UniProtKB/Swiss-Prot annotation:
The gene is pyrE. Pathway: Pyrimidine metabolism; UMP biosynthesis via de novo pathway; UMP from orotate: step 1/2. The keyword Magnesium applies. One of its GO terms (cellular component) is cytoplasm. Its EC number is 2.4.2.10. This is Orotate phosphoribosyltransferase. Disulfide bonds: none annotated. 5-phospho-alpha-D-ribose 1-diphosphate binds at residues 26, 72-73, 99-100, 103, 105, 124-132. InterPro entries: OPRT, Or_phspho_trans_dom, PRibTrfase_dom, PRTase-like. It is an enzyme of class 2 (transferase). CDD domains: PRTases_typeI. Orotate binds at residues 34-35, 128, 156.
Length: 218
């Protein structure tokens, strides 16, 4: 596992972004883990978070002209990612985000930031049903820009109603690569080597066997 991935998992555990137990999902499934991106709520969190997103983007090799953050959670993530890309990788990208309600005074419009054009990387926390992604892609295409890819913190690697995960469905629908800082598979591999987390490892591994779409046998 790459260093930044392990460090991100440690960061999530330390800030209790990632917790273990029994959590009922909207689908009715009982998940052994819970990811709460809303707890990235301190200045120090955002600085670290931006670095992890930036590392994942650079590692992916995806090229883009602009970062787009869907309101609301995608906004701070996109801004801190843009800052980290410049500070740590000397990559100075424009960013942009949408408003939930279109403003009809001042600068007006439904977007804030740079002009939405060129190759756009969509940045968000996670993909569940894919509704926010669909709305964002519609905005991107409405401005004659192209979707370069999608960057999220966590790929749950979990089947929906069919055989594909939410991310695989998005990739198939929009013919664009979805990259993540970590995956469920990464978390399982990390926990496997943590003697104090044997119970969590066992629960995640069992859940992955039942609902997962992992790329290889764990």
């Amino acid at each position: 596992m790459k260093k930044y991935k392990a460090q991100f998992i440690e960061f999530m555990l330390d800030r209790k972004i990632l917790t273990f137990g029994e959590f009922i999902l909207k689908s009715g499934r009982v998940s052994p883990y819970f990811f709460n991106a809303g707890l990235f709520n301190k200045g120090s969190d955002l600085i670290k978070l931006g670095r992890f997103y930036a590392d994942a983007l650079i590692d992916s090799g995806i090229e883009c002209d602009l970062l787009f953050g869907p309101a609301y959670k995608g906004i701070p993530i996109t801004i801190t990612t843009a800052m980290a890309l410049y500070a740590n990788h000397h990559l100075d990208l424009t960013y942009c985000f949408n408003r939930k309600e279109i403003k009809d005074h001042g600068e007006g419009g439904g977007l804030v930031g740079g002009a939405l054009q060129g190759k756009v990387l969509l940045v968000d926390d996670v993909i569940t049903a894919g509704t926010a992604i669909r709305e964002s892609v519609e905005i991107i295409h409405a401005h004659s820009a192209s979707l370069a890819g999608i960057l999220v913190a966590l790929d749950r690697q979990e089947r929906g109603n069919g055989t594909l995960s939410a991310i695989e469905e998005i990739e198939q629908k929009y013919q664009s690569k979805v990259i993540s800082i970590v995956t469920l598979e990464d978390m399982i591999h990390f926990l496997k080597n943590e003697k104090t987390m044997i119970e969590a490892f066992s629960a995640l591994n069992k859940y992955a066997e039942q609902y997962g779409v992992l790329r290889k046998n764990l």
